[in-house]
Amino acid sequence: MKKSSKEISPSQSLKNGGSDHFFNTSLMYVLAACLASFIFGYQVSVLNTIKNFIVIEFGWCTGNKVECDDSTLKSSFLLASVFIGAVVGSGFSDYLVQHGRRFSLLVIYNFFILVSILTSITHHFHTILFSRLLSGFGVGLITVSVPMYISEMTHKDKKGAYGVLHQLFITFGILVAVLLGMAMGEAPDAKSVDALGEFQKIWWRLMFFFPCLISILGIVLLTFFYKEETPYYLFENGKIEESKKILKKIYGTDNVDEPLKAIKDAVEQNEAAKKNSISLMRAMQIPSYRNVILLGCILSGLQQFTGINVLVSNSNELYKEFLSNKLITTLSVIMTVVNFLMTFPAIYIVEKLGRKTLLLCGCAGVTLAAFLPTAIANQIDRSSDLVRNLSIAATFVMIISFAVSYGPVLWIYLHEMFPSEIKDSAASLASLVNWVCAIIVVFPSDIIIKKSPTILFFIFSGMSILSFLFIFFFIKETKGGEIGTSPYITMEERQKHMGKSAV
């Protein structure tokens, strides 16, 4: 059979940014979006190493017990404020992405320029709390906007691998935040009455300012180099030729009839749903739609109960129960390096093993890591060196298990499991649930850690077992699926309900 004149060879495809190679044209678009993912990770982790320095400079705890108890509460609010803001942001993200995926990223970058400046000049608890709430709002926008942009801007066979880059850049942001925090020196006790040095007074403010520079870079890239919207959004808004043009870049070939047809089908299904008024509220009244929405929300919420954000945002406080101040920051750095490096394998195995298998493996790893120190602590002295060493080792195994599975896979899965007519709103709802659960987990972590770290590990172990069983029995594989489709709802089922709603 003779080759079509529109088809090109693999070598030609590679020259044009071919889809058969990981480093291609669409990767550049994805990386421009992943700068927002970096800001996400940085904002979640930045307080981990500098929280006590802020407590000392603002004089929240000067030795008085009541005053210091109040300081602990203020610290808890600062830790949780990002997650509280993210709840609001993720709820608003559905509205934002409807105006364009690239547009939403530009809004996010401009927003973080303002927030970074505001946080860096704060001098009071209320202003820093407000600034952190705003940071959380921006993070909430990122949780939906970036995965959606990646999902719509990549080759069908690379959605998994490129989707992992979102989580990779989150872990990179976490790592950079901890590394910059090392410049502050040894982590002080929050009850210290010693004044901070001049460098320390300036540096923690510069750390809050740093995302401003990343945001400016993101704006430059999206304004001057990667100016196109996603092909799905372009097609949806009647710009078919522009959609075809960007698809040619993504697939590295002039023959984009198949992906264009997939987008056309998804857009038509979505338009039919809009015309027939199938909103999120309407979908919740239909059993098949309600089922997939609830599954997505439960899967998203359970991710937080594995305990990852306690390890990321409060590891210094956790390690303080086991180690001297000299080792705390060093160990936190090692943990974030491990978190960053172990995200790389997920890029290559997410398409080979599939989403469900990776999720199951990750939950099994977290369960074993969290259960072992808890079980031993119940048999011997909880304060023994063995329990302490096992607890520290468990945090590393938990981080590794999460980094190769639940961390990156969830955000890929949420944009593959929902049918196109509810994808935007359902993904936003699932993201909102994720952040609500993060607040529930992170806010009391300071108090629980001071009481007994083994209680935390017991909770994480139990929730990971529950997550494993939930995924095993209820979650379906989405690997290789077409954009806008869902393994939970057949096309016939969708058309039937859309037809009914029109009656």
UniProtKB/Swiss-Prot annotation:
Which intervals lie on the Extracellular side per UniProt?
A: 48-76, 124-132, 185-205, 313-329, 378-391, 450-454
User: InterPro entries under this entry?
Assistant: GLUT, MFS_dom, MFS_sugar_transport-like, MFS_trans_sf, Sugar/inositol_transpt, Sugar_transporter_CS
Subcellular location per UniProt equals: Cell membrane
Q: Which residues bind alpha-D-glucose?
A: 167, 303-304, 309, 411
- What transmembrane ranges does the database entry give? 27-47, 77-97, 103-123, 133-153, 164-184, 206-226, 292-312, 330-350, 357-377, 392-412, 429-449, 455-475
Q: What catalytic activity is recorded?
A: D-glucose(out) = D-glucose(in); D-fructose(out) = D-fructose(in); D-galactose(in) = D-galactose(out); D-mannose(out) = D-mannose(in)
* Membrane topology of the entry: Multi-pass membrane protein
- Annotated Gene Ontology cellular component terms: plasma membrane
Activity regulation information from UniProt: Inhibited by compound 3361 (3-O-((undec-10-en)-1-yl)-D-glucose).
Domain of life of the native organism:
Eukaryota
Going by the UniProt record, its keywords in alphabetical order are:
Cell membrane, Disulfide bond, Membrane, Sugar transport, Transmembrane, Transmembrane helix, Transport
What's a Gene Ontology MF term here? hexose transmembrane transporter activity
| Stretches assigned to the Cytoplasmic side | 1-26, 98-102, 154-163, 227-291, 351-356, 413-428, 476-503
**Quick check: keyword Transmembrane helix in the entry?**
yes
Binding-site list for beta-D-glucose: 167, 303, 309, 339
Cystine bridges: 61-68
Protein family membership: Belongs to the major facilitator superfamily. Sugar transporter (TC 2.A.1.1) family.
Subunit structure, per the record? Homodimer.
> Per its database record, what is this protein's job?
Sodium-independent facilitative hexose transporter. Can transport D-glucose and D-fructose. Can transport D-mannose, D-galactose, D-xylose and D-glucosamine.
NCBIfam families hit by this protein:
SP
Q: What is this protein called?
A: Hexose transporter 1
Q: Which organism is it from?
A: Plasmodium vivax
